[in-house]
């Protein structure tokens, strides 16, 4: 379970980086050269999705919970925004949903 969760976090981080870099370019006028690491991050994201040991729809559903938590960590660390009680509650609920889905992978 820990290995799968870490794989989900790595996958989410690649997806967020792959979306954040073009956002910097379009929204903040950063260099278009950011599109090069964007492509690499998104290619790595797709490859990491193939490493998950379940049907793709189930992987995407479980991954969503970890993505929520990773995005909130990004909000705090990169954007410098303090998380609210609602952020924490939502992250816990999303993570619990992911854990329930992953726990059932071998039983479905």
Swiss-Prot record:
Annotated membrane topology: Multi-pass membrane protein
InterPro entries this protein is in?
Answer: UPF0060
**Ranges annotated as spanning the membrane:** 6-26, 29-49, 61-81, 86-106
Superkingdom per UniProt: Bacteria
Q: Which UniProt keywords apply?
A: Cell inner membrane, Cell membrane, Membrane, Transmembrane, Transmembrane helix
Where is the major localization of this protein? membrane
The record, for Pfam families, names:
UPF0060
Please state where this protein is localized. Cell inner membrane
Naming one, the record's GO cellular component terms include: plasma membrane
Its family remark reads: Belongs to the UPF0060 family.
Q: HAMAP family, per this entry?
A: UPF0060
**Designated name of the protein:** UPF0060 membrane protein KPK_2870
Q: Which organism is it from?
A: Klebsiella pneumoniae (strain 342)
């Amino acid at each position: 379970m820990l290995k799968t969760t870490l794989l989900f976090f790595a996958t989410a981080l690649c997806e967020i980086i792959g979306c954040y870099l073009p956002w910097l370019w379009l929204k903040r006028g950063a260099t278009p050269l950011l599109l090069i690491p964007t492509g690499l991050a998104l290619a790595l994201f797709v490859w990491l999705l193939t490493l998950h040991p379940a049907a793709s729809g189930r992987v995407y559903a479980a991954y969503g919970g970890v993505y929520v938590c990773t995005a909130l960590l990004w909000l705090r660390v990169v954007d410098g925004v303090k998380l609210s009680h609602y952020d924490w509650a939502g992250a816990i609920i999303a993570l619990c949903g992911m854990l329930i889905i992953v726990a059932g992978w071998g039983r479905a």
